[in-house]
Amino acid sequence: MASRMQQPLYILAEGTNRTHGRSAQDSNIRAGKAVAEAVRTTLGPRGMDKMLVDSSGEVVITNDGATILEKMDIEHPAAQMLVEVSQTQEEEVGDGTTTAAVLTGELLAHAEDLLDDDLHPTVIVEGYTEAARIAQDAIDDMVLDVTLDDDLLRKVAESSMTGKGTGDVTADVLAKHVVKAVQMVHEDDNGVFHRDDVRVLTRTGASSSATELVEGVVLDKEPVNENMPRSVSDATVAVLDMKLDVRKSEVDTEYNITSVDQLTAAIDAEDSELRGYAKALADAGVDVVFCTKSIDDRVAGFLADAGILAFKSVKKSDARALARATGAKRLGSLSDLDESDLGRVDAVSIRSFGDDDLAFVEGGAAARAVTLFLRGGTEHVVDELERAIEDAVDVVVAAIDKGGVVPGAGATEIAIADRIRSEAAGIEGRKQLAVEAYADAVEALPRTLAENTGMDPIDALVDLRARYETEGLAGIISSGRSGEIGDPVELGVIDPVAVKREAIESATEAATMIVRIDDVIAAK
């Protein structure tokens, strides 16, 4: 009987790898810390760039945390959680991805120390959760009582772009474009902002200082017929979700043609149908046609004869933008075409950039779409410039729509850490250790900023604490050959409150989830 009880019992498939207990926790924590360490040096206005080369040899040079983590070939499941943290931060508020990843790594590092001190994972989770609540309260108190005018929003956009690759055009110039773009389309009649109304298009072949804001839509399209006009002023526009082609029946049909007259009649019938498309558009006074589907070459010829400029295979997203910019309805049929179905624009023109033609649709009657047309000498420059602009647009929108702004440059994090330590004194038991550890983790963000700026991180942190105690506000300001301690609000370093909130929330959720895992079962 005893021998039967000692026989091993296998419940997992052969080849399954299982790690449990402290070994599982150590593995997960190390993986999370490694990911955070990979992006730590990119934090702040003087953060470094990373060069990422994929298996096909494609090179990406960036200091954008979300892009770095997305391009890294990460397999460890715990490490992938940090990638998800970064992605969530990017999707929700558009910036602060590196902050969220670094904070998650710091929370895991301090959790590792607490586990070494025999704190139970549940106690750590409770402490971190309580500290995150205190942090959110501290953020509430740091919200600036200011009017979100264009000047302040430019500072928000500029803070987001400072330190990112913007070529030879300065962040303040780009920030003006970004704020103007957002303000032009921010609210429609229902008070809802459509992010797709601010579009970004890039082209190499010129200095980044040639970047411009187009009040309308720019399409990577050329006319369907070379005889069409290259520009149209005061244009009436039709946006079509249909084929301008011979209609096909829903069932397969065969025609038995036995004579030349029958063949000629069939061809004439097709031509009549195709010519009818062009006639319907011309009779309605249409000057420009944007079609999401195909346009038969014969229809293109008829449209050219009528002096109508036309584009085919327009993306659905472009069609939506065109409809919002021009006031046109997206039509699935030309029957009963009415003037109210059409849109208006000041001008549609074709411009050449190297071997490419782009269509500029400017001055739409509805004025609900703008395009930031970015230029740069190389693909690497315009790609990084595009990422910087996208983030800047998102943070400006976040500042307007999601609770205002707070001081940047690590000042808010210093205030958060101070508040957590103050309230930790009133927490009983070992949970207090976890709450205090959370404060240390948050404080690692301004410490990292100082280090990346060229300051001594320990001295900078001591000075920050001292200035905060005496003046109530202090941050790491990049200036000269290194940095200095200063008032971030006075110097225009401002962040959306939503960026701070989301970083605290997502980092806490990821760290506590990883700490609670004590068993990893990996199938072969």
From Swiss-Prot:
One GO MF term: ATP hydrolysis activity
Annotated transmembrane regions: none
Record-stated family: Belongs to the TCP-1 chaperonin family.
Protein name per Swiss-Prot or TrEMBL: Thermosome subunit 3
NCBIfam families given in the database record: thermosome_alpha, thermosome_arch, thermosome_beta
Role description: Molecular chaperone that assists in the folding or refolding of nascent or denatured proteins along with ATP hydrolysis. ATPase activity is highest in thermosome assemblies containing CCT1:CCT2, followed by assemblies containing CCT1:CCT2:CCT3. Not required for thermosome ATPase activity. Not required for growth.
InterPro entries reported in the protein's UniProt record: Chaperone_TCP-1 (IPR017998), Chaperonin_TCP-1_CS (IPR002194), Cpn60/GroEL/TCP-1 (IPR002423), GroEL-like_apical_dom_sf (IPR027409), GROEL-like_equatorial_sf (IPR027413), TCP-1-like_intermed_sf (IPR027410), TCP-1_chaperonin (IPR053374), thermosome_alpha (IPR054827)
Keyword match ATP-binding: yes
Entry keywords, A to Z: ATP-binding, Chaperone, Nucleotide-binding, Stress response
Lineage: superkingdom: Archaea
Organism: Haloferax volcanii (strain ATCC 29605 / DSM 3757 / JCM 8879 / NBRC 14742 / NCIMB 2012 / VKM B-1768 / DS2) (Halobacterium volcanii)
Subunit structure of this chain's protein: The thermosome or CCT complex is a oligomeric complex of two octameric double-ring structures; the complex is probably a heterooligomer of CCT1, CCT2 and CCT3 with yet unknown stoichiometry.
Anything else known: Cannot be stably overexpressed.
GN (gene name): cct3
